Amino acid sequence: MRDIVIIGHKAKTSGDFSLNDLPGSAGRMDILCRCVSSALFLSFGMRRDVNVHLLLLGEPEPGKIIRFEGLHLRYLNPDERSSGSLIQKALQKTVTEKDIRSTPGVWVRNGDLNTLLASFEGRTLFYLREDGEDIRGLDREIRDPVFILGDHMGVTEEEEKQLLEAGAKIISVGPISLHSNHCITLLHNELDRAEAERGEIPGGEKLRAGE
């Protein structure tokens, strides 16, 4: 399983935004939508072994978590408007501290970064930062990872402190700063290659002899 967390510092936490203006009315929700697509879509299908967690910290009620489960997800297309619509529907629910299903494969709850980190107890956490250790030196060792990325604002000092206290390893996908969705694509590529070298089909299945 691969879990990917994206922190949206300005992402709106109510559903009253326009799907025609995701960058403006929704607080750069377009960035999160692109991350959802990069994390989940293949050329002719979807990564069923991936979960995406969007941490929304914008107004009016900062601290909501929307989870996209690749295994159960339906009604998602690769365009930003499609993922934006599923996010909007989730935010229109009456949200509590417990997971509430919005649509198949999409769940919403109240929570913050510590809430997410607690849910990943026992997992290996990786925090992406430009000056981190190159993933190419680690990709063959990575199993059942959780990756945490910031949005266009990066990660705050307090968030970084929480990540490091939780034991997150700082890694990088390259020497220059990239958009979050591009980082996700590169992460998948490195892990896919490592899995293929181990005789696995990305997704956790073993290649049969002769295939």
From Swiss-Prot:
Subcellular location(s) per record: Cytoplasm
UniProt keyword terms in alphabetical order: Cytoplasm, Methyltransferase, S-adenosyl-L-methionine, Transferase, tRNA processing
EC numbers on record: 2.1.1.257
GO biological process: tRNA methylation
Gene Ontology cellular-component terms listed: cytoplasm
Catalysed conversion reaction: pseudouridine(54) in tRNA + S-adenosyl-L-methionine = N(1)-methylpseudouridine(54) in tRNA + S-adenosyl-L-homocysteine + H(+)
EC primary class: transferase
Positions with a binding annotation for S-adenosyl-L-methionine: L128, G150, C183
CDD domains associated with the record: TrmY-like
Single GO MF descriptor: S-adenosylmethionine-dependent methyltransferase activity
PANTHER family referenced in this protein's UniProt entry, alphabetically: TRNA (PSEUDOURIDINE(54)-N(1))-METHYLTRANSFERASE (PTHR40703:SF1)
Cross-referenced HAMAP family: tRNA_methyltr_TrmY
Subunit structure and binding partners: Homodimer.
Family statement: Belongs to the methyltransferase superfamily. TrmY family.
Function: Specifically catalyzes the N1-methylation of pseudouridine at position 54 (Psi54) in tRNAs.
Name of the protein: tRNA (pseudouridine(54)-N(1))-methyltransferase
